Amino acid sequence: MGREKLSIEVGGLPLIEHVNNALSRSCQEILLVGGGVQLEGARHIADERPGRQGPLAGIEAGLAAAGCPDVFVAAGDMPFLSRGLVGYLLERLGNGDVVAVIPRYAGRSHPLCGAYARGLLPGVKGALDDGTRAVREFLEGTDGVEYVGEELRRFGDPELLLMNVNSPRDLERARREAGR
């Protein structure tokens, strides 16, 4: 989009602040992996792997740095992520042998909006060492992943809840929706 998108404002707040607000009630600590944007109160950590190895490497860094057994992973450009959804996914993570709880909407999983057990760290490291870069690919080969779909509607319009701002068109839509 031509500049650091996490600092772009939607509804009067930078994108990253929307995500921070959604996480702040359910998460003991906010970790910001990579990126050049600053977020007051967050602990900033770098990817542990050289080069740009994608979101799975960011998840690895976050899991490694986390001080608690359950971690919520969220992309920094989700202006409509809700506190209720974050809390719900983390709560579902505590059920039995579940190691990750991921939204699935319209046939597509959203692994950059999910709850992960810190115990997944060895599996993530191994997958990265073996050349896996895609989070979805990693999750497909992992036992104990739970996908949630219809229940997303309890927290709002799933299309908005899971929206990322990846283009000028997405930004225009987000600003329009935020103004409603």
Task: For every predicted segment, state its role.
Residues 1-160, 172-179:
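Nucleotide and nucleotide-moiety/phosphate-recognizing core
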Residues 167, 179-180:
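Long hydrophobic alpha-helical segments typical of transmembrane helices together
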